[in-house]
Design a protein with these regions (language model features):
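Short amphipathic helix-loop junctions that connect adjacent transmembrane helices
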Residues: 124-142
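Juxtamembrane intracellular "pre-TM" segments in multi-pass secondary transporters
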Residues: 72-108, 293
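Helix-loop junctions on the cytosolic side of multi-pass membrane transporters
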Residues: 65-80, 278-291
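Cytoplasmic helix-loop-helix junction between adjacent transmembrane helices
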Residues: 1-28
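Structural signature of the two symmetry-related core transmembrane helices
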Residues: 171-185
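Symmetry-related core transmembrane helices of the 12-TM Major Facilitator Superfamily/SLC fold
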Residues: 50-67, 262-278
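A late C-terminal transmembrane helix in Major Facilitator Superfamily
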Residues: 225-256
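Helix-to-loop junctions at the C-terminal end of transmembrane segments
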Residues: 156-168, 253
Length: 293
């Protein structure tokens, strides 16, 4: 959501962004949890009403923004007010030239591709594996897993964000990688529903940490003059892992079997976590050397 993220960045500072993005993430997931439930009740007998409610809620969500949120595009005075030693200082040039001046962000984007490939297993590897383990009960149990995921996001987002608020975004993302590794990796040993649910708890905690802190990190390292464009490019490239995951995972399943993909997913997530930790150390050294806040 480049436009929404850019508007949120404009309205917050580095101290309040994590809380703001966590609330946005929480609200989005409440809608994701409630939407299918409402659809299940309405879609068979009240199809027209279903689409009317869908359109109405979209319009209603826009009204507060139109009425109370002023244009957030930074003025020239606001751009000039950002200190030269701040990572959000304004830049001159097109998106690609400006991005090349920020190698840490480029590295972050490509590491995020691995994260998204791992996380994408919730919608590809997990349902296939549930079918493999539970047979005819696979779809039903996968529905339970996704319901648990939605409930966990709604219940735990505020607690997770509050608990990790003082930790740097890249460290949080590194921790998220370990949680994703444990959550998906343990499926190798899982043959009962309760183990799948423990797995879901772990990778959902990783999902929360990764999603919220990715938005915060990109926001804190985007120039005030290119916020929406940076968000667009980062989202497009980093989320390409979701496109690659089914292709690569499908080939692996054919070659080595669905059970044996989970150790590979585990190693990928651990590697991404360690690389992200290394990126944090590199950024810290560069920032100290250049005097960037």
């Amino acid at each position: 959501y480049p436009a929404v993220n850019a508007m949120l960045i404009d309205k917050t500072d580095k101290k309040t962004r994590q809380n703001a993005f966590s609330l946005l993430y929480l609200g989005t997931n409440i809608g994701i949890a409630v939407g299918p439930l409402m659809a299940g009740f309405l879609i068979n007998d009240y199809l027209f009403l279903f689409f009317m409610i869908d359109a109405a809620t979209t319009i209603i969500s826009l009204i507060p923004i139109l009425l109370w949120v002023k244009d957030t595009l930074p003025t020239e005075e606001e751009k000039e007010s950002v200190p030269e030693d701040d990572s959000e200082r304004a830049e001159i040039g097109n998106i690609f030239k400006v991005l090349l001046r920020r190698p840490v962000l480029i590295a972050f984007i490509f590491i995020s591709i691995i994260y998204s490939m791992v996380y994408a297993q919730y919608s590809f590897g997990v349902p296939l594996f549930a079918d493999h383990v539970f047979g005819l009960y696979g779809p039903r149990y996968y529905g339970i897993i996704m319901t648990v995921n939605a409930v966990l996001v709604v219940v735990f987002t505020i607690f997770i964000v509050s608990f990790t608020a003082r930790i740097r975004p890249l460290i949080n993302i590194s921790i998220a990688g370990i949680l994703l590794a444990l959550g998906f990796g343990m499926l190798y040993f899982s043959e009962a529903l309760y183990l799948f649910l423990i797995s879901t708890f772990l990778w959902t905690m990783g999902e929360i940490l990764f999603t919220v802190n990715t938005s915060v990190f990109v926001a804190n390292n985007s120039p005030i003059s290119h916020r929406a464009r940076f968000n667009s490019v980062v989202f497009f490239v980093s989320q390409s892992g979701f496109a690659l995951a089914p292709l690569i995972t499908g080939q692996l399943i054919v070659s080595i079997g669905i059970v044996n993909i989970w150790p590979i997913i585990f190693l990928l997530a651990v590697a991404a976590s360690l690389i992200m930790l290394g990126l944090y150390s590199f950024q810290k050294k560069v920032s100290l050397k250049q005097g960037i806040k």
